[in-house]
UniProtKB/Swiss-Prot annotation:
Binds a copper B center. Heme A3. This is Probable quinol oxidase subunit 1. Cu cation binds at H279, Y283, H328, H329. Its main location: membrane. PANTHER family: CYTOCHROME BO(3) UBIQUINOL OXIDASE SUBUNIT 1, CYTOCHROME C OXIDASE SUBUNIT 1. SUPFAM superfamilies: Cytochrome c oxidase subunit I-like. PROSITE patterns: COX1, COX1_CUB. Its EC number is 1.10.3.-. It comes from Staphylococcus aureus (strain COL). There is a cross-link at H279-Y283 (1'-histidyl-3'-tyrosine (His-Tyr)). Pathway: Energy metabolism; oxidative phosphorylation. InterPro entries: Cyt_c_oxase-like_su1_dom, Cyt_c_oxase-like_su1_sf, Cyt_C_Oxase_1, Cyt_c_Oxase_su1_BS, QoxB. It is an enzyme of class 1 (oxidoreductase). The lineage of its organism: Bacteria, Bacillati, Bacillota, Bacilli, Bacillales.
Amino acid sequence: MNFPWDQLLVKGNWMITMAQIGAPFLVIGLIAVITYFKLWKYLYKEWFTSVDHKKIGVMYLICAVLMFVRGGIDALLIRAQLTVPDNKFLESNHYNEIFSTHGVIMIIFMAMPFIFGLWNIVVPLQIGARDVAFPVLNNVSFWLFFAGMILFNLSFIIGGSPAAGWTNYAPLAGEFSPGPGVNYYLIAIQISGLGTLATGINFFVTILRCKTPTMKFMQMPMFTVTTFITTLIVILAFPPLTVALALMTTDRIFDTAFFTVAHGGMPMLWANFFWVWGHPEVYIVILPAFGIYSEIIPTFARKRLFGHQSMVWATAGIAFLSFLVWVHHFFTMGNGALINSFFSISTMLIGIPTGVKLFNWLLTLYKGRITFESPMLFSLAFIPNFLLGGVTGVMLAMASADYQYHNTYFLVAHFHYTLVTGVVFACLAGLIFWYPKMMGYKLNETLNKWCFWFFMIGFNVCFLPQFILGLDGMPRRLYTYMPSDGWFLLNLISTIGALLMAIGFLFLVVSIVYSHFKSPREATGDNWDGLGRTLEWTTASAIPPKYNFAITPDWNDYDTFVDMKEHGRHYLDNHNYKDIHMPNNTPVGFWIGIFMTIGGFFLIFETVIPALICLFGIFGTMIYRSFQIDHGYHIPAAEVAETEARLREARIKEREAVSHES
């Protein structure tokens, strides 16, 4: 076993050197704080080993916000480099590393855990379930994601980051990228992807088997419907990525030749594998985002969602078509006119079900009694901005025109108008919307609105000029340009917009900190002035009790909770409580994550024997779990009755306070 010590430390860049010096101090400081406040046992027992879907969701969201910061810093470094012509702020390879990691982090390690965090917190509550179908697997899934996240971020200070773009095309990612950088990409995404696939299976089964028996599919909230359909995409799309990553890993570590032309390999095989996963991946993050908008818009329009069934069918149509469009990512790679024509038409067809959704949201707003809370502001801003992303997407879908737009900043502007407005706006809106359900208090609305205005205006200032830059011929992934190119002014404006977005995000961080200390606590559950329309708002706030629902709720219409409130009924009015069975916490996922992180690290540096030892550790942990007799535990009916009585009393007091104010 010869570990490549000479590849361990990245040298020659002042930013990386500062990170290498600062990272140990950050870790030591974090350990010191946890030790000082004696939190190790609490964190391990209550969080790291928890199988409670709500706590797992919170851990996903914490990771997602941290990765938002990391990906945002990458974006600011990119904009700093391109602000002025002939800039020497970053050298070319470091710039390549930054735009590569920016894409991976924002898609894989920010957007997906943000969505999965909201799935975990909201979906079981929306369907009347006490937990997900496989609670232990849910914990394992999180730690697989966490292991991948740690490994990928470790690359910045140990070994070097991948520099072949977020698409990691062969042969650039093969023989032309020596060192551990691309290995970090392959192993980290592989480990995280296993967790994602397990999450998809888990929530697919949860929605099918754990929902309240009276809830029919067409009566489910749209966030749950979009989650269910997205899990199907996850189950079908991630295996091709898993295969592609495994093949390239064997190419790099074991000298196979799946993608090496000199030995009979096919680089285009990677492009097809990647985009067979890559374009459905866009809908893996954007369909749940559509579900978030479909919850927020009816709530603050005080109206039933228009065309609920057509929204369900439109979501299914988008999911189906998402597997028929991947070639539009490489129209210029010599596919031929017939193939390009087919994929051009199939790409345009996605605009039809997407248009159905847009019109349904607009018709929901029509004659609604709209109030402009911050989640609603993000949702309203999404519609026109996403429309611009969709229209430019149709332009790019025209294969002949794509030869002009391909690999220019026009494409960069397009997919940011699609993903930032479609996903990031939704994540921020969803976080603010369901934050009181998680924490028991709302985020400060004034600070939230400052966040919205800075972020939304900054977004348009940043990316609108990039359409013009692309039409003017500026290639993407260009690390510098000459004054004679004439791109300085628009790049300067774009950088100013990025700074405004960063300020907007800082307002959200300030809102989270400020609200923790200052916002009034709300334990009753229906936190947005009694406007809740779905089952999660019937439960208590501040992470509802472990069992979620004391009795199985009845649900016989899309807006049953609205009808219940209008007639003064509540599912808690039934006092016939029984003992509730719950699963025990388990350390299995945590230790699998530890073994995956250590084994993945050694495999990245092509040191196979320690990686195999860690693999045996993973199998040993799984075998230990298989032979463990764990029947869970029961919450006594008396304890349930006491908890529900407290919640009922708090709800009555809140109703009396509201009546007194009115």
